[in-house]
Swiss-Prot record:
Top enzyme class: hydrolase
Enzyme Commission numbers on file: 3.1.1.29
CC per GO annotation: cytoplasm
Record-annotated site: Discriminates between blocked and unblocked aminoacyl-tRNA: N10
Name of the protein described by the UniProt record: Peptidyl-tRNA hydrolase
Binding of tRNA, residues: F15, Y64, N66, N112
Catalysed reactions, semicolon-separated: an N-acyl-L-alpha-aminoacyl-tRNA + H2O = an N-acyl-L-amino acid + a tRNA + H(+)
Role, per record: Hydrolyzes ribosome-free peptidyl-tRNAs (with 1 or more amino acids incorporated), which drop off the ribosome during protein synthesis, or as a result of ribosome stalling. Catalyzes the release of premature peptidyl moieties from peptidyl-tRNA molecules trapped in stalled 50S ribosomal subunits, and thus maintains levels of free tRNAs and 50S ribosomes.
Active site annotation, chain numbering: H20 (proton acceptor)
Upper lineage: Bacteria, Pseudomonadati, Spirochaetota, Spirochaetia, Spirochaetales
Cited HAMAP family: Pept_tRNA_hydro_bact
CDD domains in the record: PTH
Subunit structure: Monomer.
GO biological process, one term: rescue of stalled ribosome
């Protein structure tokens, strides 16, 4: 099974290391680990490579989070991918920092990036990898997800990226349930 991994985030250096950009962070880790470089397309950056006979495409939308769904007509056409190849990597404030959750389907909840994707695709039946960023009720949700990780939190997030960069490239139609068990039971 070919795999289209789309990490959500906001473009621009001012969003680097913010909670909302963990999807971008994981894509950057995968690019670095596999000695790739991102190429720019109309409204996204991408890298593609093969593992054995499987094609892996890594995507960072450049549309800002709330418009992430706008890239899919272009991406599916360019890379000959379908919704069953899709894995979206996204932050989740309902999960503690360092916890991850892999799902085959799901709703958008309060996440505008997922809502945009689901509306664009006309479906919620696509894979999601949620990366827990914690929550702090002292902040408005928007302010919290746009806040940067402190140094100790950033160490934990990098440990999550290291772990996930080993796990997610092996996801296929035969291993998805096993990967769910492995990823969902991890915590950093």
């Amino acid at each position: 099974m070919n795999l289209l991994i789309v990490g959500l985030g906001n473009p621009g250096s001012n969003f680097l290391h913010t909670r909302h950009n963990v999807g971008f962070g994981l894509i950057d880790k995968l690019v670095m680990k596999n000695a790739l470089s991102l190429r720019k397309a109309k409204n996204y950056e991408y890298a593609d490579f093969n593992i054995d006979s499987r094609r892996i495409v890594l995507i960072k939308p450049l549309t800002y989070m709330n418009l992430s769904g706008n890239i899919f007509p272009f991406v599916f056409s360019k890379f000959y991918m379908k919704i069953n190849n899709l894995l979206v990597v996204v932050d989740n404030v309902d999960l503690p920092l360092g916890k991850c959750r892999l799902r085959k389907v799901g709703g958008a909840s309060t996440h505008n990036g997922l809502r945009s994707i689901s509306e664009s695709l006309g479906s919620t039946k696509y894979g999601r990898l949620y990366i827990g960023v914690g929550n702090n009720s002292a902040f408005a949700l928007k302010d919290f997800v746009l806040s940067k990780f402190n140094d100790s939190e950033l160490v934990r997030v990098k440990n999550v990226f290291n772990f996930l960069s080993e796990e997610i490239l092996g996801i296929d139609e035969f291993s998805f349930e096993h990967k769910i068990a492995t990823i969902n039971s991890s915590s950093f």
